[in-house]
């Protein structure tokens, strides 16, 4: 079976949240007989397809980038060509250009969309986009949400309950962190600290985290790409900023840390792959209750602590709890690892998607 994934960005240009999910799906379904192509946009597209692991990355020329939306003239032809070779087309929402391409370059194949997030930030443009979005979601054969929490809280998904299913995001297990790297980072940041890892974006709740760090005085390490000027301006001696780190460095930091803090306060944080990585590492977590998958990964009182969003006092209290109660923190970390093994492995996600692909392709044959 051949599957075409379609999203606005992908490797080698970008490899953050959704791109990592696409990569995991492609690699985890490869062992189940699925051949994968990924089409995305790039300001500097590669002249020929790139091999990424077991799958192929294709790039169309990005002509404009407006309101977090890449636009392209050539992607229509590229999409038609690749869709013609595929058995099924797998979209990743939200991206308005994708909806337009689907509508104008009808793939004529079974289609599904992984619904990663509501449109949260661009509320003004949402009024203009809503008709196209409605047409797109009505016309695809299946919609996949990444957590039952998001299905329950999304007003958009409520309109399509008859074709919505849940496949949680999963990640592959990894070998233990490199000992030499662990030692080098220990020399730099210490062996006991709370950790935040993630892109430094508007919805990550970093101002509240800094306020909590100020009030508690607890050592905090922040690692991630983005504008760190606000962190620097806070001038907190107990906060260490590392900038973007490699996957190997991330594993080492997770090995060292006492607990993982993930204070995202807006629904733009639809799941939180970084939380999965912390659970995989067996670390207790702190996250906010925002009606999304973050509270599906992190169960309050079981794998960690959930708090109200944008509440630095509650965040400070949760951080202090993890810091001052090692026995409870360890128990939560063990439970987090167990929950990862039960629900959130890459194999589990790949198996579920492969089964859905087979179901949709079989249904498509039945309609012919």
Language model features: what each stretch is:
Residues 194, 255-270, 283:
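Acidic donor-binding loop of glycosyltransferase active sites
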Residues 4, 182-217, 221:
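Conserved donor-binding/catalytic core segment of Leloir-type glycosyltransferases
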Residues 91-98:
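Short His-centered aromatic/hydrophobic patch
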Residues 280, 284-288:
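Short hydrophobic beta-strand element within catalytic cores of glycosyltransferases
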Residues 138-166, 171-176:
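A short, active-site helix/loop in glycosyltransferases that binds the activated sugar's phosphate group
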Residues 6-16, 20-70, 226:
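N-terminal strand-loop element at the rim of the active site
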Residues 230-251:
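Nucleotide-activated donor-binding/catalytic signature segment of Leloir-type glycosyltransferases, i.e.
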Residues 299-312, 319-326:
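Conserved acidic donor-binding segment of nucleotide-sugar-dependent glycosyltransferases
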